[in-house]
C-alpha cells in the first residue's frame, strides 16, 4: 500500500510539473459593456488618438501581456459607418507595419443583421521587431460605426495556436 501511495504521489508531482501557471484566463467585459473576451492575465486599458488613413479617432486598447506575448482588444468609433471597411484596412496595415511584417494569410467576410452591417477580417502576419522574428494573428471587425481589433502579437515561436484561438475565439460584441 505504501508503494502505491509513493507512486501516486510521484506521478502527481510529474503531472503537475508539466502545468504552466503562465496563462491565468479570466473573462473581461469592456467598461461600456459593448464587448467581452477572455484574457490570459490581468488586462490594463489606455486610450489614445489615432489616424486611420486621414480619419482621426480615439482608440481604447485593453491588453494583457504574458511571456512577451500581447493579447489585445482595440475599439474605436467612427463618425459614420461608411468608412468602416477602410478603417479596418488601416488598422490592419498599421499593426503589420509595427512588426515590419507581411501578411501570410487573410480572409474577409461580411453580413447584415437587422440592417446593421458587419465586416470582419482574419489576418496572420510575420515580421521582425528589433531583429527578432514576430508573429501577429488578428481579427478585425466593424459593426456599424464601431471598429474592433482583437490581436495576439509576440515572438514567432511563442505565439501558439491554442492560446491564440482561445483568446480570439472568445471575443463577443455585446451591443
Model feature map: region roles:
Residues 42-61, 93-143:
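Signature of long, low-cysteine stretches enriched in small and polar/charged residues
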Residues 20-22:
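Bacterial signal peptide processing site
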Residues 61-90, 148-151:
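A short acidic-to-branched-hydrophobic micro-motif
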Residues 43-45, 87-103, 145-175:
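Surface-exposed amphipathic alpha-helical segments
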Residues 26-51, 55, 65-67:
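Post-signal peptide N-terminal segment of mature Sec-exported envelope proteins
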Residues 33, 67, 76-78, 128, ...:
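Solvent-exposed coil/turn segments that connect beta secondary-structure elements
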Residues 1-11:
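Bacterial N-terminal signal peptides that target proteins for export
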Residues 15-18:
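C-terminal motif of bacterial Sec signal peptides marking the signal peptidase cleavage site
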